[in-house]
Amino acid sequence: MKKLLLESFGVTFSLLILLKLGQLFLSPKWEGLLVPTLLLYIPFLILSVQRKPIDFIDHSLRQLGTGLMVFAVSILIVFPPYMLAAHYWMLHVFHFDAFKMAPIRIFFDPLPYQILAVALPEEFYFRGFLQPMMNKIWKPKWHLFGVNLGWGWIVTALVFAFAHSVIQLKWWHFSIFFPALIFGYLKERTGSITAPVLFHAFSNAFMSWFVRNYF
């Protein structure tokens, strides 16, 4: 357990240091390339050296289909009530006048970037590489919506939210913890990062579009 703790947090801490140094000394263009590269390359390198399989990607059409189905169902469950709650939040907390439909391209245009440059690298590292290590340290003890979960699931979500603040501090970064729980759940539900990658990208693109409806 001690070895896993040192390895998981040591690798993550080193990764964040490298990303922070890149932010300080590289241009935004190169920094934008560094982040997904490290998030993909470091776990790939470690797993290759340890001769461990990359078992969190789809290995069959059936598994891919399951991931796509779980993603679609999760969107239908999560986003309608979230959108309704967020709408009233914008009206009564931020005191915007009303909802004014923004162009739908604001949602679709960033989707390829969100999938390939944001969601895939982040889910590859945090849900594919880190979360299984956390689950070995803290064995899943709870059964939630058909999935065995534990403190490893929660710790991974906390580290994910904290990592965003290390790179760029924002007051609302604490809220990243909550969708991270969904990402982690989807990974455990399907055994693959397909559903969390798609849900992650959809969430980011959706929020970019949603807030524009009030500005």
Regions found by a protein language model. Give the residues of each.
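Juxtamembrane helix-loop-helix connectors linking adjacent transmembrane helices
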Residues: 25-29, 54-121, 136-143
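Non-cytosolic membrane-interface motifs at loop->transmembrane helix junctions
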Residues: 27-35, 96-103, 171-181
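Residue-level signature of transmembrane alpha-helical entry/exit and packing/kink sites
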Residues: 4-8, 12, 32-36, 63-71, ...
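Alpha-helical transmembrane segments in multi-pass membrane proteins
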Residues: 2-54, 66
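Aromatic-anchored segments of alpha-helical transmembrane domains
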Residues: 12-23, 76-83, 157-165, 202-209
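Alpha-helical transmembrane segments of polytopic integral membrane proteins
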Residues: 15-19, 47-51, 82, 122, ...
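Transmembrane helix-loop-helix hairpins at the membrane interface
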Residues: 107-215
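Alpha-helical transmembrane segments of integral membrane proteins, especially early/N-terminal helices
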Residues: 1-4, 29-41, 65-84, 134, ...
